[in-house]
């Protein structure tokens, strides 16, 4: 060590033995300079501060006599020498030699006896009139008047919020001493340091140094030991009286009193309905942490996230943040961890993480919804309205609520033809085509439980999708009374069987029956149910008359509808 007048007592017995057994006497007659000699062996490029009288320093040294014989070394003790400068705790020459040094500077110092231990020396250790040479490396410097030093080297353009007392933060850091020696790093553990600020969970200097930081900000916080681990250090990696330097990157910030934050990005001009508790939503989202790290995205799966809201199917913050949205709206929802995944996190979401969801609402509905019909045009004569059993020809465009086109008969160049009320379209469409006249144009909105349900149509219609149909009715053929597939337009001949049985053999075959029915339809005397396969209707009619199933109908088997209610017959 660089000996103080009283510090010599701390020398170890080992060093004393080395001196007694191995140290040669000083060379007599050698001219000794009375001046302090300082050679700056290495000076760092950056030197923000130099030693002044009154500063506290920590340094390594090797002490030798002029002949090169070592008499002491801090390296041998694996500990720096720590002392105030200019307060008489050092020999005068060392007190002077340390002034003006930078951290990481190396000096060769030659101290004459008059600035060291003089003509008396130290009995048994330092001979009288000894010139002492010290190889000094300064590793730390601070002053009792120092405060926490903050140097911000990156600050994001947007800083809507800064750290306040009682906030909870997540940050990465590298912890070094003033000489750059690393003593700890959250990066090495691949885990942020998570803590409250300003309530005593941190060393005082860090509590102060974090205040005012923005998420995304990077700063260097330099802390004197009396605001860090003091004289004792931490008992492990940090020695006593060490100044600490923390290179901090703030990733996350919230307060336990925080609620969700909602920022509307795009709100459609027309918003006829806003989501309520109990509604079922389909939406896309990107989920990120506050520092922008992506943890999930519905877009990457090419599938919306579909859920009920207000019923606990999603985290509380999203349950709240999805209320009051419009179809087509884009909004940002910021969710504090106590309304997200809490202290434990989930999957790639770390514990105590604030979550940011950028959402796009595709559609929503309520299980109690029915279809919605908006008529855009009706012709002057709109007296004949569609009903169950009518045969309809119409054009349509089918889309999702966000405007995504699913299908169009106009693009196909042909109409869509159905018999109303016979399950040939989804229930919502069947309902939406009722009481419509030829030439009318209307928009029908169909909730999924009246459309294609949760399953949708693979590759065509997403599951749980609300559908929008823009319809134009082009043709309407009135159907038959319910339960009939064929009716007479006039009186039925009393000799009907004989008219069908042209060969008069008392038996009617399918060919005879079919020829006769088609002839009646062609002449306008009879009518088949429109929209169905005529041959199948005729065959079913014949089968119903063929009671014994022998492929022919006799006069005894032949009956009209009103004569036999169990069969759909003539």
Swiss-Prot record:
Q: Where does Ca(2+) 1 bind?
A: 501, 503, 505, 507, 512
Its top-level enzyme class, in one word, is: isomerase
**Domain EF-hand span(s) in chain numbering:** 488-523, 533-568
Record's GO cellular component terms: endoplasmic reticulum; endoplasmic reticulum lumen
User: How is this protein's activity controlled?
Assistant: Inhibited by FK506.
Please state the Enzyme Commission number of this protein: 5.2.1.8
User: Where mainly found?
Assistant: endoplasmic reticulum
Q: Which GO terms describe its biological process?
A: protein folding
Q: Per the UniProt annotation, where are the glycans attached?
A: 174, 286, 302, 397
Point out the signal peptide segment. 1-24
- Location of this chain's protein in the cell: Endoplasmic reticulum lumen
Pfam assignment, any one: EF-hand_5
A GO molecular function held by the record: calcium ion binding
UniProt-listed InterPro entries: EF-hand-dom_pair, EF_Hand_1_Ca_BS, EF_hand_dom, FKBP-like_isomerase, PPIase_dom_sf, PPIase_FKBP_dom
What does it catalyze?
[protein]-peptidylproline (omega=180) = [protein]-peptidylproline (omega=0)
Binding positions (Ca(2+) 2):
546, 548, 550, 552, 557
Provide the record's note on post-translational modification.
Phosphorylated.
Q: Where is the PPIase FKBP-type domain?
A: 54-142, 166-254, 278-365, 389-477
For the motif Prevents secretion from ER, give the residue ranges.
567-570
Keywords, comma-separated and alphabetical: Calcium, Endoplasmic reticulum, Glycoprotein, Isomerase, Metal-binding, Repeat, Rotamase, Signal
Q: Which SUPFAM superfamilies has this protein been placed in?
A: EF-hand, FKBP-like
Q: What does this protein do?
A: PPIases accelerate the folding of proteins during protein synthesis.
Q: Write down what this protein is called.
A: Peptidyl-prolyl cis-trans isomerase FKBP9
**What gene is this protein translated from?**
Fkbp9
